[in-house]
């Protein structure tokens, strides 16, 4: 896990994915040619931005499951966990975007769920410990490693998800 004010992971991811870099057609002037005005991580979108939303919903559902199992809750006011959620993401220009999400077939012990985002289905499983920043798991049979941080900004319930150099 790389932490700090910022990191160069998005830049490295963009560099390694650039077609000229992939084919080996680069030289010492490559960065000056392609990033003369600087680099902005927002210019390199995630291959599947809905995966980030699905992972956020999956992790939120896991936190809600833990909260619902805490003993000593006030009778009649226990934490109830549904399947429908709205994930609010912050666009690169600061605007909020909302996504309707369904998290079903939740299995807390196995750490798996089916997540629907915008008509796409994601079968996510992970046994990562809540509060752990590095989360490993699988999505639709493919392994992933992501950074998941809870309590970012002024919202203690907010999640920051970073995967493959984007968030």
What is each stretch, according to the model?
Residues 1, 145-147, 153-162, 166:
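ATP-dependent carboxylate/acyl-activation modules
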Residues 44-47, 129, 155:
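Alpha-helix capping and helix-coil boundary motifs
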Residues 18, 27, 123-125, 135, ...:
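Short, solvent-exposed coil/turn linker segments
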